[in-house]
């Protein structure tokens, strides 16, 4: 679902407040108190955004960002911190963070950033799907040779069936 947000923060009050804002705004929210829990639940082609605190026990938000970038460099990660400074924000953005917000932040600021990040994610996933379809078409054309009406119909049917979630 393209309105999914994984929220990672060790502070339960922040998790609860963010969950309430996002749920009331129509987002599907998953909450995690630790970054490693989030990574364990992160699907391969997650159609959403990760929203993470920077400073947490165990794996930090910056370490989470690095691991997410290793798995999928196009998955938006928005970092939050109450102890931010300009060099940390610059480093995070250079390392691939989609955005860097300082606590306290307004719900409108967070929602705007999430909507832009989700729009970017949607475009990335659509682009990947189109590339996959083009690759499948090229493979099919190399396998099913000929230009007869029957082969053209067969190609269309195979391509239509290939898009079904089986």
Identify what each model region corresponds to.
Residues 12-30:
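Two-component/phosphorelay signaling modules centered on CheY-like receiver
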Residues 56:
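Receiver (REC) domain active-site loop signature in two-component systems and cognate sites
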Residues 132-166:
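AAA+ ATPase active-site-proximal loops
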